[in-house]
Amino acid sequence: MASKRISRELRDMQRHPPANCSAGPVAEEDIFHWQATIMGPHDSPYSGGVFTVSIDFSSDYPFKPPKVNFKTKVYHPNIDSKGSICLDILKEQWSPAPTTSKVLLSICSLLTDPNPNDPLVPEIAHLYKVDKSKYESTAQKWTQKYAMG
């Protein structure tokens, strides 16, 4: 079941790629391990950055969410230093309905609109709330250092 669903999503994504994203298997013979590329949204401090994300599907997919992690360092209240992402649709709000394409679009939205009320990194969330311009300049510096090379 999982491999059929993943194969179908891959075909759909190749036909209709999500905006500013691409994804596919790391190795042709292993459909369960993907690498994605997310372009930093223009209306965010991540603009101009290219972010690599790993997507690991289990044999229980789509009944369990894929494990999605940033491989590129990113300064964000909902993404920690290990690349873990705090996004409700990858946790308690998961349902079998969303496709990988929709998950990637949700991650792009999170880059544009962080959720400081449900942070993985409380210090960054605090800065976002009290000094947004300092948060944005730090995020831009990290983007230049880690995602533009």
UniProtKB/Swiss-Prot annotation:
It comes from the Eukaryota. Keywords: ATP-binding, Nucleotide-binding, Transferase, Ubl conjugation pathway. Pathway: Protein modification; protein ubiquitination. Its EC number is 2.3.2.23. GO terms for biological process: protein ubiquitination. The active site is at 86 (glycyl thioester intermediate). Residues 1-148 form the UBC core domain. Ubiquitously expressed at very low levels. SMART domains: UBCc. Residues 1-22 are annotated as: Disordered. SUPFAM superfamilies: UBC-like. One of its GO terms (molecular function) is ubiquitin conjugating enzyme activity. Residues 1-15 have a biased composition (Basic and acidic residues). It catalyses: S-ubiquitinyl-[E1 ubiquitin-activating enzyme]-L-cysteine + [E2 ubiquitin-conjugating enzyme]-L-cysteine = [E1 ubiquitin-activating enzyme]-L-cysteine + S-ubiquitinyl-[E2 ubiquitin-conjugating enzyme]-L-cysteine. Accepts the ubiquitin from the E1 complex and catalyzes its covalent attachment to other proteins. Belongs to the ubiquitin-conjugating enzyme family. PANTHER family: UBIQUITIN-CONJUGATING ENZYME E2 (PTHR24068). This is Probable ubiquitin-conjugating enzyme E2 12. It comes from Arabidopsis thaliana. The gene is UBC12.
